[in-house]
Regions:
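C-terminal structured domains
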Residues: 206-378
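Ser/Thr-centered flexible coil motifs
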Residues: 19-22, 161, 283
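Short, low-complexity cationic-aromatic patches
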Residues: 46-52, 123-127, 186-193, 244-247, ...
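Short small/polar-residue motifs
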Residues: 36-47, 109-118, 176-185, 232-240, ...
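Extracellular/lumenal glycan-associated surfaces
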Residues: 56-62, 131-139, 191-206, 250-259, ...
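An N-terminal, globular interaction/scaffold subdomain
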Residues: 1-120
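Extended, well-ordered protein cores
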Residues: 97-202, 206-219, 228-233
Length: 378
């Protein structure tokens, strides 16, 4: 059995409806996943209003699960994962970024909590798949512009073009009180040489003024009716803008629920998806498949089904620790573009965590490997 990410996806496959991801599309995702380390957070982007069951693959790299070390070039001494051997210029820059991010005490290590790679998959993937790349800030990060520029210069291999930098600064300065940048993306796979800004802290009330200030080339009448119907059913909105010399027409609004990893809120997700179904943005079969995806998986009764590295870790931790896979809906995104009908996408998450019994304190601990390992210490 593989020690790569495809082993995790294989465990999730029985719970992933072919209405969302066809067997052929899943095979294409697996071709990419078997080249990547077993990151503890990955998932699928599914289009809800189209009958085609296609999906893109997302993978989150973190320090805690060792995936950051693999990207940095120090976590794969045996060369098990092909990303360590990719010679494409984009991957060479990604590894340079990973090495800087992995330096203890560096500004990137302090500011950036994780990175997210998104692979667009339309058919059989290229032998060397090229992802879009997102840096996601720590909660307490300063979000300093200089750090953003340093990160993007590493990724692009050159500083931001002056016109792009000027427009990015204008978008950040135009944020209302409470608004902040949560992530910044370099869209390598789409050959867009600008920046994607992911912004939190906006609301249906502050969004029209913000989009007007930054020069979005659309009218609020194109998105306000749908957002007004959706907003009461979500906890938080996030905005994604593609920023080059100008703000690009394509606009994304993410809809999040404030649910915990311990318990999924399928009722509220169902209510949100029903609103989209009523407006023709979500097929009924896909709505049902999304709700059915949500759940969890552990293999205490079948440890032989675990990927080898999890089996080894589980045996080393002993009988009081258990690897768990959570299946969640991370968020739903509404996409608006002037002159086009809106589109809805769902982002499914597959999250690997550990459940440990802290016998000293008489409680259970649910978290990453280091957290659970610490709870088991005598």
């Amino acid at each position: 059995m593989s020690n790569a990410l495809d082993a995790y996806l294989r465990l999730a496959a029985p719970h992933l409806s072919p209405e969302l991801v066809s067997p052929e599309a899943f095979g294409n995702l697996q071709r990419i996943a078997r080249q990547l380390p077993p990151a503890s957070a990955s998932g699928f982007e599914c289009r809800l209003g189209q009958p085609q069951a296609l999906a893109d693959l997302g993978v989150r790299f973190l320090a805690a699960d060792g995936s950051r070390a693999v990207l940095a070039g120090r976590g794969d001494p045996e060369g098990r994962f092909e990303l360590s051997r990719f010679t494409h210029p984009v991957w060479e820059r990604l590894r340079r970024f990973g090495a800087r991010w992995d330096e203890p005490g560096s500004r990137l290590a302090r500011e950036i909590g994780d990175i997210f790679l998104e692979f667009d998959v339309e058919g059989t993937p290229e032998q060397v798949p090229i992802p879009s790349f997102f840096i996601e800030y720590e909660r307490r990060a300063t979000r300093d512009l200089e750090i953003m520029e340093d990160a993007l210069a590493l990724l692009w291999g050159e500083p931001l073009a002056p016109t792009v930098r000027e427009r990015v600064v204008a978008c950040l300065e135009a944020l209302p009180s409470g608004g902040e940048v949560s992530a910044v993306g370099a869209m390598f796979s789409r050959r867009f040489e600008g920046v994607r800004l992911c912004l939190h802290g906006l609301s249906p009330e502050t969004l029209p003024g913000y989009l007007e200030r930054v020069g979005w080339p659309g009218a609020s009448a194109e998105w306000e009716p749908l957002l007004s119907a959706v907003a009461p059913r979500v906890e938080r909105l996030a905005l994604s803008l593609d920023v080059g010399g100008t703000v690009q027409p394509r606009l994304g609004v993410e809809c999040h629920l404030a649910e915990s990893l311990h318990e999924a809120d399928t009722a509220r997700w169902s209510a949100l998806l029903e609103v989209l179904e009523e407006r023709g943005l979500c097929l009924p079969t896909k709505r049902r498949a999304l709700v059915d995806w949500v759940g969890h998986l552990h293999l205490r009764a079948r440890p032989e089904a675990l990927p080898p590295h999890l089996r080894t870790l589980s045996a080393a931790l002993g009988p009081h620790a258990l690897p768990v896979f959570l299946r969640r809906i991370n968020h739903v995104k509404l996409v608006f573009q002037p002159g086009h009908p809106p589109e809805a996408k769902a982002y499914l998450a597959l999250i690997q965590r550990w459940l440990g019994q802290d016998r000293r304190r008489g409680r259970y601990v649910f978290g990453d490997l280091d957290e659970v390992r610490a709870s088991l210490a005598p």
